Regions:
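Small-residue (G/A/S/T)-rich helix-start motifs and N-terminal tracts that mark the onset
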Residues: 1-126, 135-152, 157-283
């Protein structure tokens, strides 16, 4: 499988249109499932990034404690406090939603991992899995891996190694092969790193994105990336296109912060830079 650079012009061509009659209901309705006592901010970063990427409605399913904490930071989000059964709540909300991001800050409690595995099988809309959600998927039966064609996985090298059952060094030494193998198994994979690689099942090539710099290597940056890609899944882009466009904007947002120095960049600043990055891409 050859590896080809993904261009700015190609990214611009994927941007959803902005018709005059656009309203929040047709800008994509996204569900974010995540958060835990240890990582209450992760799903908030994903939700913020989705809003900054143009999503019309973002709902957050988490514990009541996490929802309350996030609501103080993001009043624009619809909150779904845990009613005791996260899977049931998500599936009940599915008819009014267009896509889901599962995993940011979720933690590795047994019940949380079970939610991810249940949603992988039962969630009826496009799905992105990140963070501890990827840890959960490493325990999914082999036959279930191939059950979706509308999912995006966003692992770093360590998470990719766990999913493949190989060492991190093996992934690092042949990132293209690792991305290709993951894509054939799971559908569409964005392998984080420098460069980022996007590969998808049945693709004749993989794409390389080299716009990101050290300013993106901060806590929460991956949660921002997940929310950005999730927004485009909710707007109707195919998994491959959502991953490519989201990764492009994530890199461009980071580049906008670079003149101020790469030290001390916050993930929330990357999320806030998505909006001007998208406007620049349209110009």
């Amino acid at each position: 499988m050859p590896l080809q650079d993904f261009s700015r012009a190609e990214a611009a061509a994927l941007l959803p249109g902005r018709p005059a009659n656009m309203h929040k209901g047709n800008r994509g309705r996204l569900l974010v499932v995540g958060g835990s006592d240890r990582y209450p901010g992760a799903p908030a970063l994903s939700a913020l990034a989705a809003l900054r990427s143009g999503s019309g409605v973002v709902s957050l399913l988490s514990s009541s404690v996490v929802c309350a904490a996030c609501a103080a930071r993001l009043p624009e989000v619809v909150y779904l406090p845990d009613g005791g059964d996260w899977t049931r709540t998500a599936l009940n909300e599915a008819p009014s939603l267009a896509a889901a991001v599962v995993g940011p800050g979720l933690g590795r409690a047994a019940e949380s991992l079970s939610v991810v595995r249940d949603l992988w099988v039962r969630w009826p809309k496009p799905l992105l899995v990140d963070g501890d959600g990827l840890f959960a998927l490493s325990g999914v039966a082999v036959e279930a891996c191939f059950s979706r064609g509308d999912a995006v996985l966003t692992p770093h090298e360590g998470e990719a190694a766990r999913l493949l059952g190989i060492s991190s060094d093996a992934v690092r030494n042949d990132r293209l092969s690792a991305a290709r193998r993951l894509a054939e198994r799971w559908g569409c994979v964005l392998l984080k790193g420098n460069p980022t690689i996007v590969a998808w099942r049945g693709g004749e090539m993989a794409r390389r994105l080299s716009w990101g710099g050290p300013e993106l290597s901060v806590p929460g940056s991956g949660d921002v990336l997940s929310g950005c890609i999730g927004a485009f899944l909710a707007m109707g882009l195919a998994a491959r296109d959502a991953a490519l466009l989201g990764a492009s904007l994530h890199g461009m947002a980071g580049a906008r912060l670079r003149p101020g120095g790469v030290d001390g960049v916050l993930a929330s600043e990357i999320a806030d830079a998505l909006r001007p990055a998208m406007e620049a891409l349209r110009s």
